[in-house]
Amino acid sequence: LDHSRVEAFLKTGAAGTAEEQKKMCEQMHLTDYNYLLLIPAQERQAETHVGEELRLMMIAEQVRQSYGRTQFVYNTTEGSVLVVLTLDKGTEAEQVQMCRQTEALHGLLEMTEPLILSGRFTRLEQLSSVYWQARNMAAYSDRTQKVCYLSGESLVRVTTTDITSLERLNEYLLSGRAQEAQSLIGE
């Protein structure tokens, strides 16, 4: 994908013509089950002095190894890395596995800050909004966590071992019922 087109899309949410949108969806491998993973900017990591290109190649390879297939990996202009994770069927087992793989990726990348993982989005048009929510919420992330889960406009503090029913948790979070989500996390 053309870097300037992707950057313009992330900033404005405008993906261009229907043909351009279709091409972008194909190149990002979008399915009905997409999740955004935001990896913090390089300058915010301790002791990392790797060029942007090399860093992006290394992250892309770690992502491929962690999730077992190629995912869309993109280096934003502010230095964070955006990864579009896709699932085949969006089953609870797939989602829990994705969360575990994301926590493992945190260790492989030797991150000092948490990764931000969004809830599900289904359309290309939603990507820009999800990206900005993740980017804005990164400043408020819990530094003691490997992964912070973004739900709507708030971060949810959970680890994959706390999730007994990811589908039910997603339902609570999407409907704004944070109290029920917290009680589910406590189970």
Task: Tell where the protein language model's regions lie, with residue ranges.
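Soluble C-terminal extramembrane regulatory/interaction domains of multi-pass membrane proteins
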Residues: E94-Q95, C99-G107, Q179
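Interdomain helical linkers/hinges and coiled-coil/dimerization scaffolds
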Residues: L1-Q95, R120-E180, I185-G186
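Catalytic core regions of nucleotide second-messenger enzymes
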Residues: V73-E78, L105-L115
